[in-house]
Amino acid sequence: MERTCLAIILAAGESTRMKSAMSKVLHPVAGRPMIAHVVDALASASISDVALVVGRDADAVSAAAATDEVAVTSFLQKERLGTAHAVLAAREAIAKGYDDVLVVFGDTPLITAAPLKAARDGLAAGNDVVVIGFQATDPTGYGRLIVKDGALVAIREHRDASDEERRITYCNGGLMAIDGRKALDLLNRIGNANAKGEYYLTDLVEIARSLDGRAIAVEAPEEELTGCNTRAELAYIERLWQQRRRHELMLAGVSMIAPETVFLSWDTALAQDVLLEPNVVFGPGVRVESGAVIHAFSHLEGAHVRAGATVGPFARLRPGADLGAKSKVGNFCEVKNAEIGAGAKVNHLTYIGDAFVGAGSNIGAGTITCNYDGVNKHVTRIGANAFVGSNSSLVAPVSIGDGALVASGSVITEDVPADAVAFGRARQDVKPGRAPILRERYEAEKAARKRAKAAE
């Protein structure tokens, strides 16, 4: 029978060092709150029940952690009296009698399912407490994990460690799994006889051993246990997340010419044989199909780029942009809430918003769909194999039929039937010999302004 597990996320800190108007766990990593990354890792570890311990910005933190994947229940920690005190804020949930209780932090967005599963496996093997640790590049300041004959005998804080213990690089990552049948008894035994008068979760190791229980440590990569307390650490975590995701995508068949310049969101979906040129930014909600090319300096958000399509350089796809197979959106173009049909071309200096562009159509440089009247948005519909000449304004709501041709420089305010040619511009008026007369007048006006300025 599968073991039951309650995960407790500690997210009640004041976030003082973050120097922010909102809780640190609400700050985004790869486009979503860092606490949402933690919840996602728990879901990936097949954990279905989460107790979220909240304090500052409780409602916003609870909303950010909400998901369809796991059941999240929030518990308010009214006082800040240490990590064990925070865990006991979820006493009601712990008392339900889960097999495993897993304690994690809301500010560790790089954690993955693997060490969480390893910790639970440690409980399944008969251990009472399992601490998740890491081999520190620089262990200074971290609590050391003292392991003897495979058992974790103590967590020694740096300030209390002997010289020999300080040479240990196996450090406490803070995350912990506890035998759910014993969790409340063990937690209730933690005292606060220390300089700060706080209740520390790390005391569980020695308490369990004093009751003839057993504690062990399992190892996770150091980066997965990176916590976030400052803006500098937030930037570092973002960099680590981006590096990890880029590497995964390249191994899956995505080509990146300069991967360090590509920035992804948490849900960016890139298929095999997608090519990304340098300096591409993906906001949330982007899906790119096989064979598509995203040229340099493009920004995509909420967009679907279908197989073989090309984007950019210097293009912007906003939410609702849907590019058909082998279509093209070129340099200095913006597409928003619009469908570009298969093989259609929007090559240069164009805005397509709230529109449908049919398959095979060609939209000339400088074309604008005038979709907003100051109050409401309106739709432009362009049929298949139509041609819109350069520098045209399509004033929505308006339709251009299949195979129609719109002359350059037109302002189109009425529907254009299929296969029709539409001219929507003033007739050109040429006045022979008039240029020298106008030039002479302009020079005289310029000279008069100079004389007036000199006389001031």
From Swiss-Prot:
Location of the region described as Pyrophosphorylase in the Swiss-Prot/TrEMBL record: 1-231
Major localization class: cytoplasm
Active-site annotation: H348 (proton acceptor)
Binding site for UDP-N-acetyl-alpha-D-glucosamine: 10-13, 24, 77, 82-83, 143, 157, 172, 229, 318, 336, 351, 362
Sample GO molecular function, one term: UDP-N-acetylglucosamine diphosphorylase activity
Family: In the N-terminal section; belongs to the N-acetylglucosamine-1-phosphate uridyltransferase family.
Database matches in NCBIfam families: glmU, PRK14353.1
Protein name listed in UniProt: Bifunctional protein GlmU
Organism: Rhizobium meliloti (strain 1021)
Gene, per the UniProt record: glmU
